[in-house]
Each structure stands twice: as C-alpha cells, then as structure tokens.
A protein has these predicted regions:
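Beta-sandwich/jelly-roll carbohydrate-recognition scaffolds of carbohydrate-active enzymes
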Residues: 2-314
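C-terminal capping/lid segments that line or modulate ligand- or cofactor-binding pockets
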Residues: 16-50, 356, 404-405, 480-507, ...
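Non-catalytic C-terminal accessory modules of carbohydrate-active enzymes
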Residues: 71-124, 130, 607-611, 618, ...
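Structural helix-adjacent loops and short alpha-helical linkers that scaffold large soluble proteins
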Residues: 306-313, 328-331, 363-373, 433-448, ...
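Helix-terminus loop motifs that line ligand-binding clefts
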Residues: 327-341, 367-427, 433-434, 440-442, ...
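Carbohydrate-binding/catalytic loop surfaces
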Residues: 337-348, 392-415, 467-486, 554-556, ...
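Acidic/histidine-rich catalytic neighborhood
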Residues: 456-524
C-alpha cells in the first residue's frame, strides 16, 4: 500500500536505517524511530529527539587558524529521551532479541500521521503476548510526542510490569571518520531540573554555552483492572512503574510535551506543565483524528498520484511526508539537511532549502514557504556582519551552513567560498513574489533582501574590458573549489542584480514613500542601483566556442578529465577516498553545477548550448551528492532524454528507502526528497514560473499510465493530469487564468476541465 511504509521483518542489520526511515516529526519536534524498549547490547542505536533550531555553540579547532575563520559552530542537540518503556512479562523482560518473534509488522502511516509496531512474542519461558505500539508527533499540538501501547496476554500470565522512564542524560552521535557527521562535542546539555508536580514528571536540560533550555513534561495513564503504581527519581531522570495483575489486556499511554527557550521564553517548565494540563481530556484516538484532519488538508493539494508504478508512488509520498515532518513552520526555524530525522550535518541549514525544498512548499503550501523566507530575513543582520568580516563594505553574505545566522563551516573552500548561497536565497524571494504576488511581503522583506544581496555582488565583482567578473568563489560542485567566474555563481548573481534593480523601479512606481523609507534606512543611492543594472547587463558568463558549452569556470576545461569508468566502486564517494587537491585538479563534478544553472535560469541560454553542456558535464559527474540526480532528471526531461529522465528520477524517489548512499542512518536526505517532487513537476510536467504566469510542457514516462498533481498560484489551486496522449488542466479553487501549454496560451475557467490531446 502506497500510503503505508511497511517493515515486515525484524532485521537487526537495518536498525539504524529504519530509525531514520520511521522517524516522526512536525517541523518543531522530531523523534527517531527507536524501539521504546531499546536494543540488545551488541547493536548500536542513534537514539534521538530533536527540536528544530535548538542548539549549542561548540568551539572549532584549527591546526592553523586565519582571520575570518569562524571561532564556533552551532550544533543541533539530542534532547531529553522520553521514549523509554520496558515491559516485563512476569519476570522476563520483553525484547525482540530474546525469546521468539512469532510475527512482526512495523508501519508508518503517511495518511494518518502515526507509526506502529505489531508484535507476537514468545518469551524464553514460553509465555505469549501480543504488543501493539503506536506513536505520533502531533501536527496540531507541536510540543506533543505521544506513545500508546496495548498489551494482550495470549497465555495465563500472572502479572505484567511496565516501566516508563524519561532520561535527561543524553548526548549526540559522533563519527570521526565521516566529515558529514559530527566528530566531537557529543555531550552539550546538563540536567538542570528533575521534579514531579502532581502526576507530571518534569526534566529540564540546559545547553552548555548558549544556555538555551528545554523541558520535557511527561504524563502516563494505564487502563488495567488491577494494578499498582510507584514512581521514583533516578539519576538524571524519573521512573514510573505499573504492576498489572491478571490476564486482561492492558492499555498504556504516555504523553511527552517539549518546550524550549526559543519558542516558549524563559519559563519553559511552567509552559510544558500548562500544556500537559490541557491534554488531560484528550485520548490517543482524539490525537489520531487531529492528525488525520491535518493530513487530509495537506495531501489534498500536495499529493502526487502515479498510475503505473507502486514503488515510485510510495517513494514520492514518503519523501513529501518526511519533508512535511521536518520543515520549520515558524520564523525561528528552517529545514536542516537531514531534517529532524538524524544528526548528519549537525542540524545545519544550507542552500538545500532554497533550491530543492522551498519550491515544493511554494507551489503547494505557500505559508510554509513564507516562513522559510522569514527565517532567512531574521538572520539578515548576521549576514551583513559576515560580509564585513569578508572585507565587503556593504551587502549581505549568508552563511553556508548555520542554524541561527552564524557561519558554521570550518572548511572555507567548500563552505564560505560558496557565495552563491546569497543569490540562491534572493532567487527564492523572487520566486515567492512571482507565485504569490504578495505586495506587502515584497515591501516589508523581499526588497531589502534583494538590495542587500545585490550590494554583495556589486562589491565582490570587478570589471575587465567592460565585463563584470567574479573571482575566487566555489560553485555547487564541491570537487572544484576557489575558481574565477563559476558559471552558476555568475548567472545567479546576474539574476539577483537585475531583479534588485527591477524591484527598485517597481516600488518607485507603485509605492515611492515605502521605497524612500527603505533607501534612507539602508543609505541606498540611485547610483548603486544603476551599478546593479550595469553589472547584471554585463555579467561575464563563460562559454567555450570549440565545445559550444558554458564552461563551468575559467579553468575547468583546461584540467585533466577524471576517468570515472576505471574508478573502483569502493572509491565512491570520492571525497572519502581522495585528497581535495587531487579532485580540484581534475574535470570531475560531485553534482550538477552548470546544468543546475540551466535549469533555474534556462532563459539565459539557447537550447543548443544547454544540450551540449548537459551532454558534456553528465559524463564527468559522480552524483556523490544526493542533490545531483534530480537536476539531471529535470534537464533530461527538457532535452527529450526520456529514459535518462526516468532513471535519474528512480534514484531520487527511493534514495533513502533503498539506502543507496549508505548513510541514511545519519538522517534522511531532505534536498533529494524535494528533488523527487521537482523531477515530476518541473521535470516530467515541465513547469516553469515565468513573469507572465505558469508554463508547462507535460510528458509521460513510458512505464506510467498517468500522473496527477496540484499546484497553487496566486490564490488558485490548479489540477494537472497527464495521461497517455492527453493532458488536462483545471482551476479547482480561485479565479480563472491563462497558462502556457507547450508555449501556447490556454485559458482555464474556474471549475471547467480543459483537455488537450
């Protein structure tokens, strides 16, 4: 069933991967899919709960530290563990690693918003029980993580004991061999409060340096004819014990409420207790109904239906669901590279948000997209300070990786040097304006962001023979660092500069008083705006006459080509097996670079150049980055390479489900998940957002019968259905509009389906 991810075998070798796959979250709180009872000692677990943006600052140690290197980096923290539930069947501890597992089923219900384990277990002494665990992280009450357990004795069992714990002694996972995972600073929280207030158990943790606080307040409830209860404080936690006698079924519920300083202010424990008291009247079934209502609304617009391939249908729904679970829904947070499913990349926000994830929400849930932009706006002052540190008198340089605005990248060649992130962020603000026409947002936030990022480019580049050039930067391809005139960077900077000038003119015509106030606040002059226009108009975009392609940068095509065909499979990803300088000296791409620019800014080049460039760069791309395959799928669709488009899409759709990059244990690949949706909507369906409106050119993979999706545009919901030999469009909400279908204008009247054969 494509609405349900099922694991029907208890495979010990897949435990860590399944912890990520079966994680739960709501954008504020995330919990990995651990077993409540834990594992046997021979198996490791990354047991985790995370609050989006809740972090500590840790010192960066350099062998040689130079000016401008960050002193510290931010790190998402594994917070208080409230998952613990141990079950004793008489005197035998329930464990899937002892006795006999008679049947096992584990499900993630993506339409209903909960996960479950259904187990028939025979103890070493022969006692049989059925255990049904359900858990959810509430979309309606963002602070709530709830667990429900039903225990059914299948034999004459005298007593069952349930031991529930909350543990404040937690630490982060480290891996010294993988640069994508933290290598130190595992413990960054100390327990600052342990107490009980009536029936509520309370633990508070405080971060070492930021002094941010997090509280978990827990209540438990049992339905059993005969039971005894006791609780006690243990070291760094609280333990509750229920001893149930008789052979009747037992129902146990555990509600865990998390609050933190960033959202709840200084009185985090009082806030957690208050929320707990409001939950008393809510049964677990009530919470499930709230989940279903929320998800019905989400899937109504966000679902992508594929007729013809159940595995890929499961893949796209799983990826969209995990994006929803991880994306921040308040301006205090964004979406981390691994979301809230794990600790890879230390909970940092990258350009992944703007280029791969933001478009999904922009076209389906624009309010969520707006919050992502508001988070970037909230760190604008930090970006201004970072620009000054890098020697720029004006402008905003956004951090390559961050949580609350400070640069957290210690390796500047593949970090700070990726100046393109500022243009990527500007690009997302422009796309938001085109899709929503939110004039107030433009005046209050977007214009300032565009002006400050344009200032960065004007100060970074210089003119040679009338052409505007940008030196010593790194593009998306991290196997090629510190180059002059990276095509992607220059093309995105050009877009940024020209749109900043255009928005300045637009505000001058439509709301001159607002513009004047902004100019005065920024000390912005007319000469600066003219300089943006000139720099954009005269931006140098590398082009090779002999190959008739856009050169990735000034020196890339002069390098020796890496022999990918003869590189042993065990040497991938290359970054784990070759020194960076070895990679930098070759023509080899970690991911799409020039090809990505041609996707985002296809109007800047003719189709022949785009095709030639794709053919050239695809041959030397390793796809070591999970951000690569989706872009190659999208552009293969545009160029008519149907099989390539489909094959690359396959890679994106099930990358985590199949653990193809071998690091899903550290968390799910959020950008790739966004890329799955992009591969269908921007790839197969050919969607582009033009200034004139939506433009589509739908194609259908040979193996499919049809696909259907919805998109939002300027207050409308538009349904797109592509079948064999035809495509239909319908405005299901909002006013009618004109769209482009294969470059031809088509008017869509509200409620009337238009079918084109």
């Amino acid at each position: 069933m494509t609405w349900k991810l099922t694991k029907s075998e208890m495979d010990p070798e897949s435990l860590l991967v399944n912890e990520s796959l079966l994680s739960l979250g709501n954008g504020y709180l995330g919990v990995r899919g651990n077993f409540e009872e834990g594992y046997s000692t021979e198996y490791s677990s990354i047991r985790g709960a995370y609050i989006n943006a809740f972090h500590d600052n840790v010192e960066i140690t350099y062998g040689e530290k130079l000016y401008g290197f960050p002193d510290t980096q931010q790190k998402i923290l594994n917070v208080i563990d409230s998952q613990g539930i141990q079950i004793h069947v008489e005197d035998e501890l329930f464990s899937l690693f002892t006795g006999e597992v008679l049947s096992y089923e584990r499900n993630l219900h993506m339409d209903a918003g909960f996960s479950e384990r259904i187990i028939h277990w025979k103890s070493p002494k022969g006692k049989k029980v059925k255990l049904h665990f359900k858990r959810l992280v509430s979309f309606a009450i963002k602070e709530l993580f709830a667990i429900d357990v039903e225990i059914t004795p299948l034999d004459n069992i005298q007593h069952i004991t349930i031991l529930s714990t909350i543990n404040g002694d937690v630490s982060n996972f480290i891996d010294k061999e993988d640069p994508r995972v933290a290598s130190g600073h595992s413990k960054r929280l100390h327990v600052s409060e342990v107490r009980q207030e009536d029936d509520i158990s309370i633990i508070k943790n405080t971060a070492y340096t930021t002094k941010l606080e997090v509280t978990c307040a827990t209540t438990t409830h049992i339905t059993s004819k005969h039971h005894e209860y006791e609780s006690q404080r243990i070291e760094n936690g609280i333990e509750e014990r229920y001893i149930c006698t008789g052979s009747d079924s037992i129902h146990f519920a555990k509600y865990n409420v998390y609050t933190d300083t960033l959202r709840h202010g200084e009185k985090v424990s009082e806030q957690a207790v208050s929320i707990q008291r409001q939950l008393k009247a809510l049964a677990f079934e009530d919470l499930l109904q709230e989940q279903r209502r929320y998800l019905d609304d989400f899937w109504k617009v966000s679902d992508v239906e594929i007729d013809g391939d159940a595995e890929l249908q499961e893949g796209i729904r799983f990826n969209l669901y995990q994006l929803l679970q991880s994306v921040g829904k308040d301006p205090a947070s964004n979406i981390a590279a691994k979301g809230l499913s794990g600790e890879g990349y230390e909970g940092h926000y990258f350009w992944d948000t703007e280029i791969y994830i933001f478009p999904v929400f922009l076209m389906t849930n624009p309010e969520i997209a707006k919050n992502l932009l508001l988070h970037r706006y909230s760190i604008l002052d930090s970006a201004r300070e970072r620009a000054k540190t890098l020697g720029h008198e004006k402008g905003a340089l956004f951090p390559w990786r961050t949580i609350t605005g400070a640069e957290s990248s210690a390796f500047f060649p593949a970090g700070t040097a990726q100046y393109h992130i500022s243009a990527d962020i500007a690009y997302s603000f422009i796309q938001y304006y085109l899709v929503t026409k939110d004039e107030e947002f433009l005046k209050d936030y977007a214009a300032e962001m565009l002006f400050e990022t344009a200032r960065l480019w004007a100060d970074t580049g210089h003119r040679v023979n009338g052409r505007f050039r940008i030196d010593d930067v790194t593009g998306p391809d991290e196997y090629t660092c510190i180059v002059n005139n990276n095509y992607y960077t220059n093309a995105m900077a050009k877009y940024n500069l020209l749109w900043a000038a255009e928005i300045h003119q637009l505000l001058k015509e439509q709301d001159a008083p607002s513009l004047k106030r902004l100019e005065e606040r920024l000390n912005l002059t007319v000469d600066e705006v003219k300089d943006w226009q000139d720099a954009g108009d005269n931006m140098y975009l590398p082009y090779d006459e002999s190959l008739k392609i856009n050169a990735q940068d000034d020196s890339f095509l002069q390098k020796s080509r890496w022999n990918l065909a003869d590189t042993p499979k065990e040497k991938f990803p290359l970054l784990l097996h070759y020194h960076p300088l070895t990679l930098y000296r070759h023509q080899v791409c970690k991911q799409a670079d020039t090809i990505l620019a041609h996707f985002l800014l296809e109007d800047q080049q003719d189709l022949e150049t785009i095709k030639n460039s794709y053919d050239y760069y695809e041959k030397i791309t390793t796809h070591d980055s999970s951000l690569s395959s989706c872009v190659h799928s999208i552009m293969a669709s545009k160029l008519g390479y149907e099989q390539k488009a489909y094959d690359y899409f396959n890679e994106t759709a099930r990358l985590d489900l199949e653990n193809t990059h071998k690091n899903t244990k550290d968390g799910l690949h959020m950008a790739n998940m966004g890329g799955t949706w992009l591969s269908i909507v921007y790839g197969f369906a050919g969607l582009r957002i033009k200034e004139s409106g939506p433009s589509l050119a739908p194609t259908l993979p040979k193996k499919w019968n049809s696909y259907t999706f919805h998109m939002q545009y300027q207050g409308r919901v538009i349904k797109v259905h592509k079948a064999r030999g035809s495509v239909s469009y319908q405005v299901v909400e909002g006013e009618g509009l004109s769209i482009l279908h294969n470059e031809n204008s088509v008017y869509l009247e509200t409620g009337r389906e238009v079918t084109i054969s």
